[in-house]
A protein has these predicted regions:
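Conserved ASCE/P-loop NTPase catalytic core
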Residues: 1-119, 130
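The conserved phosphate-sensing helix
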Residues: 158, 168-183
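Conserved AAA+ ATPase core "coupling" helix
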Residues: 8-17, 119-152, 159-163
Length: 183
């Protein structure tokens, strides 16, 4: 019943962990900015609470961010910090005080994919995961993918094209891109 979200570390528009908007330099809602109140912005790990978070190409993720993700997985919460947060300030709304004091919930199932070598992923993060490895596609499988892609693209090609493309890659996506670029 939970949410399923997809995130790619190469996409910088959606923060994974979340952030705190500095009321002076980054701006905040008018009612918060005038009082100098920092505004926590929950990220995708909080949005995925109770559901699934899929991280595509986790191997491209900065190692520091991998460690932050590890902390979230361990605590099942995201903690927010800001030099502008003053727990004694009576003007801070209760919901913001609660986010700073208790954090935001982030209990989710993490599914991640990578084409990188397992050794390139944080060992601590890997130790908390069930790993599934897929064998590289065979040249015959690549050729079959090319024939299927050619049908979908309505491309007529010479009989040997699938075999030629299969000599250059073991990835289905790259193979279909080669076909699309050629035709």
């Amino acid at each position: 019943d939970g949410t399923t979200l997809r995130w790619d570390p190469r996409d910088i528009t959606n923060p994974l962990i979340g952030s705190v908007h500095d009321p002076i330099y980054q701006g905040a809602r008018r009612d918060l900015a005038e009082g100098g109140v920092p505004e926590p912005k929950p990220g995708l790990v909080t949005e995925a609470h109770g559901g699934i978070l899929f991280i595509d190409e986790i191997g491209e993720m900065d190692p520091m961010l991998q460690n932050k993700l590890l902390k979230v997985l361990e605590d099942k919460r995201v903690r927010f910090e800001s030099a502008y947060y003053d727990p004694t300030d009576a003007h801070i709304p209760d919901y913001i005080r609660q986010l700073f004091d208790q954090g935001a919930p982030a209990d989710f199932v993490l599914i991640a994919a990578t084409t990188r070598s397992p050794e390139e992923i944080s060992p601590a993060l890997r130790s908390r995961a069930a790993e599934i490895f897929f064998e590289p596609l065979t040249p015959e499988q690549i050729a079959e993918i090319i024939r299927g892609a050619a049908k979908k693209l309505r491309v007529e090609m010479e009989e040997r094209v699938p075999e030629i493309i299969s000599e250059y890659t073991i990835e289905g996506r790259k193979a279909t891109n080669l076909l699309a670029d050629a035709y």
